[in-house]
């Protein structure tokens, strides 16, 4: 996780208990899997009601590149082929131009979220930061209502979290 963020268990407690909106307690779970011997690679996952909603890893991003047709080889065989175009594509398509993100981008977004006020986070250009913010207990019902105005501008995966929070706060009466 890095010194700025502390331990994963501490960060998970912060995200799932300390800062999570009361209406979502017990419904959101974060997971981190670290792979020994793979240069510190991790997979971060977000679960809602025990269903994985979002995954953050190099492999998730690379699979996105392949499935979206960004690679010259649409059917890589073997590890070398699979990863051959990853780094150039990662450089060519920064996070704001894709819908899948690496573990490092997850950590950077989490650090940004932790180190700025909630209003900056909810208006962030980074959709991962906005995900953390919309689940935050400091976002009230009036702010949630205002967020509905920008709902269509959100990536599909972020909309799921907006809807989840809005429905949790309103018992499903206002959101579509």
Functional labels for PLM-detected ranges:
Residues 1-176:
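Alpha-helical scaffold segments
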């Amino acid at each position: 996780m890095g010194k700025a963020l502390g331990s994963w268990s501490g960060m998970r407690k912060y995200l799932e208990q300390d800062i999570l909106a009361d209406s979502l307690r017990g419904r959101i779970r974060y997971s981190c899997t670290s792979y020994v011997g793979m240069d510190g690679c991790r997979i971060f996952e977000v679960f809602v009601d025990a269903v994985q909603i979002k995954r953050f890893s190099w492999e998730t991003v690379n699979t996105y590149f392949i499935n979206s047709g960004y690679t010259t080889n649409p059917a890589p065989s073997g590890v070398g082929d699979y990863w051959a175009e990853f780094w150039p594509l990662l450089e060519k398509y920064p996070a704001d131009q894709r819908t899948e993100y690496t573990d490092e981008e997850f950590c950077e977004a989490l650090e940004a979220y932790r180190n700025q006020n909630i209003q900056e986070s909810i208006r962030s250009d980074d959709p991962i930061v906005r995900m953390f913010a919309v689940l935050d207990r400091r976002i009230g019902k009036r702010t949630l209502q205002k967020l509905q105005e920008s709902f269509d501008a959100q990536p599909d995966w972020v909309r799921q979290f907006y809807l989840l929070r809005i429905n949790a706060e309103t018992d499903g009466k206002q959101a579509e």
